[in-house]
């Protein structure tokens, strides 16, 4: 397995750069086999994440780049992870606070929690990074998975 951080949420092999996705379902269909084969999620994860995203969209109107952070219930996750994706172009993603509004997501932080109460603190830490336009610019311009891994682990203290 690739580099892991001490907090065991970020993994270099769960960083995807510049892949083209037409919609959220295509994104989930692509990432699910990676997560399943890596032992991160159960077979039920794919359907659960699609249903949850449909009911509770997760795109945030952050600037200068839009961030989505989909997640689902803990019973679908075997071990915790954050799967970071920088899209090639953007992915149409429904806004968290306004389900009828579709944003163009640049980044996806696909979150896997396996403890019921552990996610609130993580979400707050992520949100505080997402309002930092310098951090988002660095993610956008990073050249390699390792550079992204270093940015994530040095800016998001889990």
Predicted features and spans:
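Cytosolic covalent-transfer regions centered on His/Cys nucleophiles
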Residues: 1-158
């Amino acid at each position: 397995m690739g580099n892991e951080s001490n907090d065991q949420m970020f993994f270099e092999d769960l960083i995807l750069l510049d892949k083209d996705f037409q919609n959220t379902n295509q994104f989930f269909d692509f990432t699910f086999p990676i997560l399943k084969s890596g032992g991160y999620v159960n077979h039920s994860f794919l359907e659960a994440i699609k249903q949850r995203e449909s009911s509770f969209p997760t795109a945030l109107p952050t600037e200068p780049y839009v961030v989505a952070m989909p997640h689902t219930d803990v019973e679908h996750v075997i071990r915790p992870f954050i799967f970071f994706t920088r899209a090639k172009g953007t992915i149409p993603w429904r806004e968290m606070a306004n389900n009828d509004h579709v944003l163009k997501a640049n980044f996806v932080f696909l979150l896997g929690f396996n403890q019921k109460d552990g996610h609130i603190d993580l979400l707050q830490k992520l949100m505080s990074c997402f309002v930092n336009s310098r951090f988002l610019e660095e993610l956008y311009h990073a050249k390699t998975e390792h550079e992204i891994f270093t940015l994530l682990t040095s800016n998001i203290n889990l």
